[in-house]
Amino acid sequence: MPWRTALKVALAAGEAVAKALTRAVRDEIKQTQQAAARHAASTGQSASETRENANSNAKLGISLEESLQILNVKTPLNREEVEKHYEHLFNINDKSKGGTLYLQSKVFRAKERIDEEFGRIELKEEKKKEENAKTE
């Protein structure tokens, strides 16, 4: 008899925990979706653009914002300005001039990330041109 009561109590407790966990997961998913929508609205990016940006950040190990800060450039991006700042910082941080390989690597990675962004911008412009050509 006591085992039966203990089993009922354990099952009731397990059921309550399962319901609470399910509700918490549902709430977390809803909040994540709302946060993604707010981020997309504030940046003006679609969900796929945000995903592409996150993939680029993960692949290269550096965010676009960090890259812009390292090379001291602002948006909208200008290739000549980026190249000028990159050359200057890369040469200044040369080991023979008292720089370090670490800093040169950071400058190189920042340029690499910005180049990736230039590629995405060009791809977007090409798609836009193709769509305009199809509609005409």
From Swiss-Prot:
Its main location: mitochondrion. Residues 42-58 have a biased composition (Polar residues). Keywords: Membrane, Mitochondrion, Mitochondrion inner membrane, Protein transport, Translocation, Transport. Residues 66-119 are annotated as: J-like. It is a peripheral membrane protein. It is found in: Mitochondrion inner membrane. The keyword Protein transport applies. GO terms for cellular component: TIM23 mitochondrial import inner membrane translocase complex. The J-like region, although related to the J domain does not have co-chaperone activity. Regulates ATP-dependent protein translocation into the mitochondrial matrix. This is Mitochondrial import inner membrane translocase subunit tim-16. It comes from Caenorhabditis elegans. The lineage of its organism: Eukaryota, Metazoa, Ecdysozoa, Nematoda, Chromadorea.
